[in-house]
Amino acid sequence: MVDKLIVAVEGTAVLGPYWKIIVSDYLDKIIRCFFGVDSTSQKSSAADVEVSMVMFNTHGPYSACLVQRSGWTKDMDTFLQWLSAIPFSGGGFNDAAVAEGLAEALVMFSVPNGNQTQQKMEGKKHCILISGSNPYPLPTPVYRPQMQKLEQNENIEAQTDSRLADAETVAKTFPQCSISLSVICPKKLPKLRAIYDAGKHNPRAADPPIDTAKNPNFLVLISENFIEARAAFSRSGLTNLASNHSPVKMDVSSVLPVSGTQSISNSAANVSVISRPPISAGNIPPATVKIEPNTVTPMTGPGFSHIPSVRPALQPVPSLQASSPLSVSQEMVSHTENVQEMKPIVSGMTQSLRPVAAAAANVKILNGVAQAHQVLGGGTSIGLQSMGGTPMLSSMISSGMASSVPASQAVLSSGQSGVTTMTGAVPLAGSAQNTQNSAPSSFTSTAPSMSGQTVPAMSQGNIPGTQMMPSGTGMNQNMLTGLGATGLPSGTGTMMPTPGMSQQGQPGMQPVGVNSTSANMPLSQQQTSGALPSAQSKYVKVWEGNLSGQRQGQPVFITRLEGYRSASASESLAANWPPTMQIVRLISQDHMNNKQYVGKADFLVFRAMNQHGFLSQLQEKKLCAVIQLPSQTLLLSVSDKACRLIGMLFPGDMVVFKPQIPSQQQQQQQQQQLQAQHPQLQQQQQQQQQHLTQLQQQPLQQLQQQQQQQPLMQLQQQQQIPLQQSQVPQMQQQQIHQMQQQQQIPQMQQQQQIPQMQQQQQQQPMVGTGMNQTYMQGPARSQLMSQSQGSSQGLPITPGGGFMN
């Protein structure tokens, strides 16, 4: 007697943020109790169960597939891996196709001949509906098994029931098929409760109490017939629960005598399970894969293409059946079972099998990452310094290492690792000598081959790199740790080629071309084969989680991400990263490219498991996402390659920009502006001198008029004239002194404006908690500036609550 369980999950992005909580707090407990695993992790030998999964989406063009299902498995660990690897994407605009998902579960539970006696011989059947959206309100064409009635005249009514139905109508069929229906929802939606009530065996029975104190907003409804699930949430456990319920004992005892005949009849009737030929890969032992029949229309891509488990090839894999392709039809499996994808080495894993059809672009993604890292030379901890006033970042973020680094077509043998790169050919030139391009006959001298075979480095296409000319700027020693080079002077030297830097906007740089036959890597004339011992350069997976944004203040799942760091970077780089990265704000990429940062930044490569419209909007609008980590700040931008993102990781909760030294052109422009203002000052001085002469002439004219009009008062006027003449120079001196002060005021203002302009250039905004504030550089950087110009220097920021339009 085999008990069966089907988990029907909504695959849209609405359920993504809550999925880990649902699996850890509810599904994990139910499945372990269903498999008979007690608290000591000892599996009961009497447990004979099978589990499967159905994933449904929404109607409309926003979902690639309406309904997908997996095969049956008897391995608990494999099924838990399936659940943890569900790709939640799309949807969110329409109601979920709950009716189609429940109907698919009924098809998987149904008996081919519909015999009631045989149905009684089968074990218990349970279904758990997990959805975060309301069901589609209109009846849709779904398939439901036709239950044979005792009277023949009722067959017509049974045939008419399987045409159009909504979710509640499909749920009413579950009690007729002796299937228990349970519901888990992260929101208390009344329509999902109505579906649960429609699927109850006894509508008047009270719902068993479930402790939801940890998640008060969750709707958890467990069927009264799902004894294992109720025992998983009860503190007393399965033993006390079985002793307190006598109907359970009677049910088990009545079924036990027919267990022998049931196994025979079940094996004879279960013709839907088709054994597949063994699949062998490397050192993995073969295992039988069971595939469900083709009951729905074949589709272009396989369902759950990334669900198979990844384990080291040196360890035995007891159940590859768990990693069987969760497909929609046999036809799809026959086309996709031989497709392999090579992934970067992840903590000792050498090779992973992944049935891929529509996701073939992922092969190019990681190969492109290997090529990008081939030019990086294994060092991602780069001290970003100024090279003669030219920013080193240039178009690193805007191009995203995509336009300059094409996908590789390197041939990898089955015994080699997934990524083979070289670091010995990275140029390191002296300060007094320019490097030259040379074409070595082979890479055996600078990059030894792996496993006795030559390493195919690059194939077709040009990989433009950059060669920094020496300008007396110190070289960061962290860049050389991956190459094993020590004792190099830090005061001089050239920087390593950085992928993604444009050739037009970088003066003093030389492109490094790579053709299809030989790689022209710049090598120093003083470099020998034994001077720089090469090390295998690879990217290591350090993090996997979700990327979410905000829409109207609520978190919205965007995509599933995988983060990769360089082998030379710190192992504890992502030690305290949360499982979900929350985007707090958006900034412009153009502003980032024109700035330089204080301290060092770690470059990381992220791979998006599925494409989302928000990522394409970031690329079109040239925006960069800011993510606040517990002790770091991550700037994330989308590259030109599909599903690839570039991350810049900075320590601390803010990013500090380097002060910009004004170039010679800017100084010349300032001098020209000052010279243009000098003629204006000269004109003002001339006008002031004319005004002084007028003031001097006015008192003399008044005295002459008075002498002509009053001849009788000449004696008195003669006595007063010396006094007035003595007063005129005093008035002239006062007026001249005032005019000189007025002339000095613009000059002082100009002298004060020049230091203010220099201070404004040195004061740069920061990304992080102080996005709308300006901080002083140096020791007093944490003090707020009181100038009114500080608020106008902030980065152009899209409001955090509305960037997910």
Swiss-Prot record:
GO BP annotations, alphabetical order: positive regulation of transcription by RNA polymerase II
Source superkingdom: Eukaryota
GO CC, alphabetical: mediator complex; transcription regulator complex
A Pfam family it matches: Med25_VWA
Region spans: Disordered: 430-455, 786-805
Low complexity bias locations: 438-451, 786-795
Function: Component of the Mediator complex, a coactivator involved in the regulated transcription of nearly all RNA polymerase II-dependent genes. Mediator functions as a bridge to convey information from gene-specific regulatory proteins to the basal RNA polymerase II transcription machinery. Mediator is recruited to promoters by direct interactions with regulatory proteins and serves as a scaffold for the assembly of a functional pre-initiation complex with RNA polymerase II and the general transcription factors.
Subunit structure: Interacts with MYC2 (via N-terminus). MED25 competes with JAZ7 for binding to MYC2.
Family according to the record: Belongs to the Mediator complex subunit 25 family.
Name of the protein described by the UniProt record: Mediator of RNA polymerase II transcription subunit 25
